[in-house]
Curated annotation (Swiss-Prot):
Subcellular location: Cytoplasm
Organism: Neisseria meningitidis serogroup A / serotype 4A (strain DSM 15465 / Z2491)
Name the record gives this protein: Cytidylate kinase
Gene name in the database record: cmk
Domain of life of the native organism: Bacteria
Record-level GO cellular component terms: cytosol
Similarity field: Belongs to the cytidylate kinase family. Type 1 subfamily.
Major subcellular site: cytoplasm
Keyword Nucleus: no
Annotated binding of ATP, by residue: G11, P12, G13, A14, S15, G16, K17, G18, T19
Keyword list, A-Z: ATP-binding, Cytoplasm, Kinase, Nucleotide-binding, Transferase
CDD domains the record matches: CMPK (cd02020)
Length: 218
């Protein structure tokens, strides 16, 4: 089996996999792909076009012609900067909804694979190691306790780690976990050949170092 110059990092929402993947890519000089961003973009694009998230035929057509551009650290949709707009909890739930549609996943699959060049790639998502890059050199399932993930998300958006707003974040994370684990197509789960990395008690720096140490031993 020919291995691909890819580190695939999968895991649940708000586990820190995006931050870790981006830093690992920078350390190695590899490109970085946030596969979840494509699903979030699809959900946002469908919303803007007035298409329901469960309308498989129309959402899959929108996914095929997604007018998205990744420029440095910004993400553009039809020329509009939506870098922050796709990170809301509502769009996250939309992404989870469209990700359950087989035709949408098929529409986005080749687009994700096209990000791989000779330079190398670090990709994060929910099925990057199992479906998108099954021949990745290193596969990691990165996770953390749901309350820890909720606390990290709360700090990220500047709200206290208690009260109704925090409970809503925790509830949203747990609801998305449930949806991702139980979807019929590419459900979220650790693959047999993926290394488990629980970051509940680790800093970002410690997590990045762990991933790099593992990769250098591949």
């Amino acid at each position: 089996m020919n291995r691909q110059k890819v580190i695939a990092i999968d895991g649940p929402g708000a586990s820190g996999k995006g931050t870790v993947a981006a830093r690992v890519a920078a350390a190695l000089g590899y490109d970085y792909l946030d596969t979840g961003a494509l699903y979030r973009l699809t959900a946002l694009y469908a919303q803007k076009q007035g298409v329901g998230w469960h309308d498989e035929e129309n959402v899959s057509e929108l996914a095929k012609k997604l007018p998205a551009v990744f420029s440095d650290s910004r993400i553009l949709l039809g020329g509009e900067d939506v870098s922050d707009g796709i990170r809301t909890e509502a769009i996250g739930m939309g992404a989870s909804a469209v990700a359950q549609l087989p035709k949408v996943r098929a529409s986005l699959l080749q687009r994700q694979r096209d990000f791989l060049t000779e330079k190398g790639l670090v990709a994060d998502g929910r099925d990057t190691g199992s479906v998108v890059f099954p021949q990745a050199e290193l596969k990691i399932f990165l996770t953390a306790e749901s309350k820890i993930r909720a606390e990290r998300r709360a700090k990220q958006i500047g709200i206290p780690c208690e009260g109704l707003a925090f409970e809503r974040i925790l509830s949203d994370i747990e609801a998305r976990d449930e949806a991702d684990r139980n979807r019929k197509v590419a459900p979220l789960k650790q693959q047999p050949d993926a290394l488990l990395l629980d970051t509940s008690r680790l800093t970002i720096e410690e997590t990045v170092k762990k991933v790099l140490d593992w990769y250098r031993k591949v």
